[in-house]
Design a protein with these regions (language model features):
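Intrinsically disordered, low-complexity segments enriched in polar/charged residues with Gly/Pro
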Residues: 1-4, 44-46, 89-91
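Charged, low-complexity, helix/coiled-coil-prone segments
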Residues: 28, 36, 75-77
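Mixed-charge, Lys/Arg-rich low-complexity intrinsically disordered regions
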Residues: 1-14, 19-23, 30-33, 104-107
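Intrinsically disordered, low-complexity boundary segments flanking structured domains
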Residues: 13, 42-47
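Charge-rich, low-complexity amphipathic helices
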Residues: 2, 37, 46-48, 80
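Residue-level recognition of conserved beta-strand positions in structured domain cores
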Residues: 26-28, 60
Length: 107
């Protein structure tokens, strides 16, 4: 798990996508793009994010569907709703929630 001063968001924060209708809780951070080139090229060129920025791993939800998402910092906004994220893996990674943030389970 990574933490750094150059990431705008932190592990445990609930965020929403700037352009698409989904939200999620951050469970890991890559400080620059760290996925496959095939995945990157599958994003339409006109909306493809820069690689030289943090990318976040999310336990995401959209309507009644849950999944894991990999999203660039430029496409995220803080979710201020304080509503819990309803993802089946939340309890495996986080031990609780206070306000709008989740807390990691200590190893």
């Amino acid at each position: 798990m990574a933490t750094s001063n150059n990431a705008k968001f932190s592990i445990g924060e609930v965020v929403k996508h700037r352009h698409f209708d989904f939200r999620g809780v951050i469970y890991d951070v890559d400080f620059e793009f760290n996925n496959s080139e095939e995945w990157y090229q599958s994003i339409p060129k006109e909306v493809r994010p820069r690689k030289d920025q943090p990318f976040y791993h999310l336990l995401a939800e959209s309507n009644e569907v849950t999944y894991e998402a990999y999203v660039s910092e430029q496409n995220l906004l803080l979710d201020k709703s304080k509503e819990p994220v309803k993802h089946p893996l939340i309890e495996e990674i986080f031990s609780g929630k206070k306000g709008s943030s989740y807390f990691k389970i200590s190893n």
